[in-house]
């Protein structure tokens, strides 16, 4: 991905410490965004590439805004139900 956003998981020692202290914690979207809010971009957007969970979080927020539904509802309505996936669960974190 070429956004330049840092990953809130990879290379984030504070996140790692909290994750290992409570591996079953359910993180809120805001808590995940807070993990990167004070960190600078890794590079100018479009000039390089890196994997970042952050990009998927932001994509989910954009989809929720555009659809007017939360992500679990949107996934159920647009993906899981049409495919007949009845034993698939959503993980927010």
Describe these PLM feature segments.
Residues 1-52:
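Active-site-proximal loop and beta-strand segments within enzyme catalytic domains
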Residues 1-13, 38-40, 61, 65-93:
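Active-site helix/loop module of the DD-peptidase/beta-lactamase fold
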Residues 55-60:
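Well-ordered alpha-helical segments within folded domains of soluble proteins
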């Amino acid at each position: 991905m070429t956004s330049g956003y840092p990953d809130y998981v990879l290379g984030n020692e504070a996140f790692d410490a909290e994750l290992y202290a409570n591996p079953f914690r359910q993180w809120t979207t805001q808590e995940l965004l807070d993990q990167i809010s004070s960190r600078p971009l890794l590079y100018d957007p479009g000039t390089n590439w890196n994997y970042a969970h952050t990009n998927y979080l932001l994509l989910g927020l954009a989809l929720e805004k555009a659809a007017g539904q939360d992500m679990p509802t949107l996934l159920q309505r647009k993906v899981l139900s049409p495919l007949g996936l009845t034993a698939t669960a959503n993980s927010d974190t």
